[in-house]
Amino acid sequence: MPNYDASSTNTSKRANVKYKDLDLDFGRNTVTSDVNKLTDVEAVKRSVRNLINTSHFERPFHPEIGSSVRAMLFELMTPLTALNLQRKVQEVLVNYEPRIKLVQIAARPNYDSNAYDLSIYFYIIGSNELINVETFLERLR
């Protein structure tokens, strides 16, 4: 007979896992008057964006979570900087987002806007759909 308690982990390999996160826009659910929840793909997309935009020491009690992507935006725009940006994004996502399997990261310099167009392609674990997250990284003072 299996022993189920709060310290055991789920070793199930089922394909349809439901992911939930809070909506950080803090929109109100009209039925429950609670904060809206993001589910599945939208929750994972929001988490990916948040990890990229989080700097080290920004999260209380978890200073190790974050990336130096924002600091890299103040460097010269060269192909080498774009490659380093891709590596930093890959590092933070591999280390802190276990729900995804990365396929490709593309950072394209936009010289006119002095920013980068960042495209991230990944699969959500347990899903066969290729997800694309595109974001525009620019310097903020």
Question: Which ranges hold each PLM region?
Answer:
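Short secondary-structure junctions
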Residues: 94-102
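Immediate N-terminus of the mature polypeptide
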Residues: 1-86, 91, 103, 108-141
